């Protein structure tokens, strides 16, 4: 009996699977059963979709773990060379003649500090966030970063997968949600800049009153994200708050001059503002027009603060 079959699936699991399946596209790596199928999906189909969602969730947790590991290492080794940071881009991709894959990477999407080929530690390309196969494109991307004209709007890569994979690539490329995972070495002298910043952290106004990092716990509903973000359900939002007295965490000479002029002409020159000096990346599982994807946001959570 159908009812007996459905009882083999855990109730909370099936509710989660049905909720996720309602967001997924036809034909993708996380596709729904065919719309024309009138009967309710059986346990084997539910198990298959549940496994695919678990795979996406595992990729999310793995990426989050790598990002946190990068951050923890960097925070505890500020005088050493930190581990590579992870950034995820979404290049344009098309399948050319002979089974070649052509990638177009917009320069506007490249992280700060590129194009410096020496900063690129590793680059991995996948046709979708859930694809099991990836291509190491570190060498061709380094070459493009070294040779391409700085004014060129995009970088172009051509991949030559094995002939045995051409048919599968042809089928997957039409519904691809490509992902380029970059592992970047940090820019030089970062730890020394942080050490100098910590030396000027004594607040003349009293503890907790000057420019500093502040954390607020917020739900997806609080942020207005509940209709498009699936995970995490709660975010520890870090932001910069506090006053900017003279010489406190001044970002540059302009901030110092602004402080001096504010003392002389407070009605016409505003005081410096406390703003983020750098950011921590954040990974979201989010709904898209074509299904569910992982997305890294590089400028969402403040990491350090200064006055400007």
UniProtKB/Swiss-Prot annotation:
Endpoints of the signal sequence: 1-29
* Pfam families in the record: TGF_beta
Region (Disordered), start-end ranges: 152-177
Any one GO molecular-function label of the UniProt entry: hormone activity
The record ties this protein, via Gene3D superfamilies, to: Cystine-knot cytokines
- The set of disulfide-linked cysteines is 203-210, 211-274, 240-305, 244-307
Q: What name is this protein filed under? A: Growth/differentiation factor 15
Q: Which organism is it from?
A: Homo sapiens
């Amino acid at each position: 009996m159908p009812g007996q079959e459905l009882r083999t699936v855990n109730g909370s699991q099936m509710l989660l699977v049905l909720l996720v399946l309602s967001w997924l596209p036809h034909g993708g790596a996380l596709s729904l059963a065919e719309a024309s199928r009138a009967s309710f999906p059986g346990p084997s189909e539910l198990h298959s979709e549940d496994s695919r969602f678990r795979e996406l969730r595992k990729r999310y947790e793995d990426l989050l773990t790598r990002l946190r590991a990068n951050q923890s290492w960097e925070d505890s080794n500020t005088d050493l060379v930190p581990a590579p940071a992870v950034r995820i881009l979404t290049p344009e991709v098309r399948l050319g003649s002979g089974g070649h894959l052509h990638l177009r990477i917009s320069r506007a999407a490249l992280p700060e500090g590129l194009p410096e080929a020496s900063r690129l530690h590793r680059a991995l390309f996948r046709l979708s966030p859930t694809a099991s196969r990836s291509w190491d494109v570190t060498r061709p991307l380094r070459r493009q970063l070294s040779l391409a004209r700085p004014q060129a709007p995009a970088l172009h890569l051509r991949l030559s997968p094995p002939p045995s994979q051409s048919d599968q690539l042809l089928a997957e490329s039409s519904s691809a949600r490509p992902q380029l995972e970059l592992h970047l070495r940090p820019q030089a002298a970062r730890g020394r800049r942080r050490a100098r910043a910590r030396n000027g952290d004594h607040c003349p106004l009293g503890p907790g009153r000057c420019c500093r990092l502040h954390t607020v716990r917020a739900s997806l509903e609080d942020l207005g994200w509940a209709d498009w973000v699936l995970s995490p359900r709660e975010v520890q939002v870090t932001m910069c708050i506090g006053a900017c007295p003279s010489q406190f965490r001044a970002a540059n000479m302009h901030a110092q001059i602004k402080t001096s002029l504010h003392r002389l002409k407070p009605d016409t020159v505003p005081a410096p503002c406390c703003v983020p000096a750098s950011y921590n990346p954040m990974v979201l599982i989010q709904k898209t027009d074509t299904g569910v994807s992982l997305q890294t946001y590089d400028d969402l959570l403040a990491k350090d603060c200064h006055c400007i």
